[in-house]
Amino acid sequence: KIRAMELIDDVERDARGPYCGAIGRIGSDGDAAFNVAIRTIRLTPGENDKHKAVLGVGGAIVADSDGMGEWRECLIKSAFVRGRAGGHDLIETMRFDPEEGIALLEPHLERMKASAAELGFAFDRHDARNRIQALCFELEEAAKLRLMLTRSGAIALEVQALPEALGEPATCLALPHPTVAGDWRLRHKTTDRNFYEEALAMAQAAGAKEALLVREDGQLTEGCWTSIFVERDGILLTPPLELGLLPGVLRRSLIEEGRAREAALSLSDLEGGFLIGNALRGLIPAKVITP
């Protein structure tokens, strides 16, 4: 037993947690009840802040065990959870230009790879890049390119005309944030965008082009399809990711270039003018309107 645990410590990257041990209770009268903790979902405060739970799955590996067979056993044991996973897809929306191609292709693929790893999607980044590049060779005009990824790893590409210009300044309506900062949907670009769509519909009904989401503490997070920027002393300020918002590709590019940095923003910070933007449209001057 001791030697086995020494070997496990050498070859396994992470601690196994409680799933391969026992869990139980001891009453004040000395009565005890214990059971193994397999098929037990562990939820800790730190993980719950990110709306994330952990399920440990494994098997009894012996000298003649087959690696693929053990992996199939793990899939069978975890099927009761995996079968209930959300039916959403991951998406990336990119801008194709005949002269420049897709300028931010690698950051788009990197974001999808990170989301796929965290949410349990299969993703072949090399294959996705090759298929995008092959499609771009067929395009002659600027276009909107949408990459979609299913949980199983299937990729789909859509080409659409670029959206019409919004006009400047683009009108925005401030609305209460519809969810909590720990909602996983804020950190990943998926087809599960109902709360964004509802907020945007409210803004459009009031005559605005975009909705600005405001937390209960008054801090701005993002728009429904854009990041928010305020220029101060030649630097663009944009809300921090920790507040609960999408890590936008344009946003990341501007930060890495030294043109932007994270800072807390409220509606009062927008009074002198601000910008909204994404990788498809670039930066757009904007203003807040009242309903």
Residues of each region from the PLM?
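Helix-start/capping segments and mature chain N-termini
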Residues: V36, P45, D66-K144, M148-P291
